[in-house]
Amino acid sequence: MKLGINGLGRIGKLSLWHHVSRQFFSEIVVNLGRQVGSGLEDIAATIEKDSSYGRLSTYLHGHKGGRVIENLNEAAGTMTINGVPVTVLREARNPKDIKWQDNNVRMVVDTTGVFKDPTTDAGDPRGSVRGHLQAGAEKVMVSAPFKIKSKGIDMPDDAITTVMGINDDDYKPEQHSIVSAASCTTTCLSYMIKPLMDHFGADRMLTASMVTVHAATGSQKVLDAVPAAGVTDLRKNRSTLNNIILTTTGAAKALGLVIPEMKGIGFIAESVRIPTSTGSLIVLVLNLQDELENPIKRDLINSIYKDYAATTQYLKYSAGQNVSSDIIGTPEAATVIESTETHTRTASLKVNLDHLKSCNIDAGSGPHILEVPVTQAVIYGWYDNELGSYTNMLGDLTVSVAERMV
């Protein structure tokens, strides 16, 4: 089977690395949608070298690895990477105009981050993720969370958000043609929430909050720039080189699509961008209803993660002391739990029963103050937001979907 990759940005390029290493797909067709440099040689150089992960040849075969991109044919737009035939398309940017059918591509991974609304018509002149289906693809993977622009419109029945190993069983090949692999942050967060959800249950999770200390992304500015017309968040135009920048994340909303039980739990998600190229961290804070006879302690939280990590390749449990560069390139790990920094504090939450009357709740007679034991747990989870965590997880999900295509 052939795989199509739309876009050659950070996730597109690293997805190409992943799949030429994995060699599940017989051929790969990459759509750039425009001319690059002086030709195919410059595209090959862009694929070979990476500022965060080094050379493709080293990634594939270690430091003694030789040239892995060969047989360049400018006229045909073809090359061979690690023995895998790769065709580069440089004509169409609108998904509906990409020649997937002409190249016998049945499955496409859209890594542009542009086409995220599955309700947009395939023929939209601005482009739509559905355009890939019109152009001949049967399945489309999206390397970003869905974002429906029009309010009040439900998610189409043929679209689904999944995280490999969390809810990928919800994918139905006969029903779903567009699959979002959520985001790097949602993927990491899923593996921080799921073990605790399985152990405690949703009824004991009172509230949750998280902040992702996130590496810079391509949407940010290298140097300060003048904002475009209509821009409301001026910080997005400030230099990423020397600033800590407050921004937003849709991880809380996307998490509810992956772990539905979280929809009933008050959850706040925030994001801070920092001047590093990759390697990010989630600080998760959970308030859990405790039991006096069996209080929740740090060791219990860590044992839950350690036991869960023994059952899956996607969660790593670390008893060491890591910094962000230690996480870069970590293979197939959605999350690395920094167990040395897990903390818990238990206190009595005092509820004034008189206040419940305004909620039409009969407090009855007796004490007017109810004390409920509550434990606040703080957990740290590392993730390589590019290759190590997200791209590898996306690659596994892509292969999983491909294996179920008839």
Label each region the model flagged:
Residues 1-222, 226-235, 369-373, 383, ...:
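N-terminal Rossmann-like NAD(P) cofactor-binding subdomain of oxidoreductases
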Residues 6, 10, 103, 127, ...:
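Conserved active-site and cofactor/substrate-binding residues in soluble primary-metabolism enzymes
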Residues 12, 53-81, 257-268, 272, ...:
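A broadly tuned preference for mixed-charge, low-complexity surface segments
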Residues 29, 268-272, 281-406:
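C-terminal active-site/capping subdomain that shapes the small-molecule cofactor and substrate pocket
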Residues 162-164, 222-223, 244, 328, ...:
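Short clusters of hydrophobic/aromatic residues that line enzyme substrate/ligand-binding pockets
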Residues 167-169, 183, 221, 249, ...:
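Short capping/connector residues at structural and topological boundaries
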Residues 201-277:
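Acidic, glycine-rich segments within the central catalytic cores of soluble metabolic enzymes
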